Amino acid sequence: MPPASEVAVTAPFAGTVIAIAHEPPEPVRAGAAVVVLEAMKMEHEVVAEADGVVRRLEVAVGDTVDEGQLLAVLARGEASAATRDETETVDLDTIRDDLAAVRERHAIGLDGARPDAVARRHEGGQRTARENLADLVDPGTYVEYGPLIYAAQERRRSREDLIARTPADGLVAGVGEVDGAPTVVMSYDYTVLAGTQGMRGHLKKDRLFEVAERRRLPVVLFAEGGGGRPGDVDWPMVAGLDCRAFHLFGRLSGLVPLVGIASGYCFAGNAALLGSCDVVIATEDSSIGMGGPAMIEGGGLGVHEPGEVGPIEVQDANGVVDLRVADEREAVTAARRYLSYFRGPTGDPVTVPDQRTLRHLIPEQRKRIYDVRAVVGGVFDEGSVLELRRGFGLGIVTALARVDGHPLGVVANDPSHLGGAIDAHGADKAARFLQLCDAFDLPVLFLCDTPGFMVGPAAERTATVRHFGRLFVIGANLTVPTGTIVLRKGYGLGAQAMAGGGFKAPLFTVGWPTSEFGGMGLEGAVRLGMRRELEAIEDAQEREQAFQTAVAAAYEHGAGINMAAHGEIDDVIDPADSRRWIATLFDPPPPDWRARAHKKRPNVDTW
């Protein structure tokens, strides 16, 4: 043991002396290095345990020492003020050379370093990838993955050129909060090789898709781009069909909300990812297709301009697009709004439309058309309705909405299209929406006004038997609360499909005063059921009178009040009481999907 006036400096482990930090008789403060040892190719400072002056050294540079070996002896004493100032003062604003180099490299890929590319983007009426992500995520919450990668093309271009011209390999991606909720966000960068999918970019996607799966994070993807990139010559491959991105992304379906945004040209692999999303948001200038002009021409299918491949007018009407918006700014707003329905109750004060208005929205004249969207808007919290796929399956309205801040899904018949009859497209639209709601624990309200399924030779050529079957199979297997309100017509199998397969399947089935019911269209039922009686009447005028009398009796028998009196529905209600039924029967809401360990459904059907 050294005397109390001395401090021993010993080796904490075996190593080699590579430097002497303080020589005798230099003063040294507590915590300052006396000797530097190297062990396992790492340098370790051996520090003084107390202030003092170096009295003697027991080792020299190059010596090998054992653990516990004496290295130096200090005489206890206070280090000089100069020594303290020299060793303790650190300018926290100083940027070291290594950090400066990292910052410089990051800056190369930012919009500020690429003014020409940014200008071209703005001239075309679009924003950059980074501008879109900055608009989407909450300020100060975004962390980027893989900003330093570049295209795998060093066999044909210089590294400096690739760093400058292919930043992030054309895919800007990371994690940030969207209205307070962590979300994986990514955008192809059309200013980099036309937004094509590079091999290193694929690895970045893979990484983030796995992060989304492990953390249960929603994904928002800006998908503009030209598909696969054949020019990544550094990557040893034949066809690249072992790419994992599409498998990993498809595995997220039904696990987390997936939002795809298309602006400009979105072809091939980019479109494949877009089409795998739960919701597709597309701008007016978008053109979406599974093959771009080069692929089309290469297949001998003619020469086409990019805008001719899958313009918004086509893709909106055929059901590819869920939300049609003017531009990228509106697309970001729509994405934020869509995601809000998957975070539970808002907790914000709500404005409730005057429920008395609902009493007057269905005409007393039973054949008069009305606006079913006015009904939807009148039932739910003001401003809370977000309609999906409005341009497709026109006889069905599918929307997300809220009652007292609680989110739910709405499926309604639109009598202005085919009188509310359900056709193949309408059935597909409703069936897919039901899967979406069930996957993420959103209760479903059906607003029924249908004469039934669309029939006839033309309808059967659209494979209605199978399309209609989807409604029954999916509806019967919903695990979320459901309810049905019959606004006017509730006829046949179509009406049953608007109740999950039958009027006893929902938690409640009620009618408004205008509701009417039948196993099939009543005129057809009378003609079929009274065929012999009607044929026996020789006088045509008398026969028609008998028919009309029977039809009137059938309508009276099928009135909502009589239906409720026979217990086939739960009640006929004042339309102004509709919200009370919804709020009461859908409370408590289903568990939050984010708390589940596994998927409820294997996936959400993309169609």
Label each residue range with its predicted role.
Residues F13, R29, A50, D66, ...:
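A cytosolic small-molecule/anion-sensing beta-strand core signal
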Residues A82-W607:
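Ligand-binding clefts of soluble mixed alpha/beta catalytic domains
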Residues F13, M40-M42, M498:
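Methionine-biased hydrophobic packing positions in alpha-helices, especially
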Residues M1-V36:
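Acidic, low-complexity mobile loops and tails
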Residues A11-V17, A48-R56, V65:
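Generic structural motif
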Residues P2-V9, A39, E78-T94:
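Periplasmic scaffold and linker elements that assemble and bridge Gram-negative envelope complexes
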Residues E26-V47, D66-A82:
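Short hydrophobic beta/alpha edge segments that flank linear recognition/processing sites
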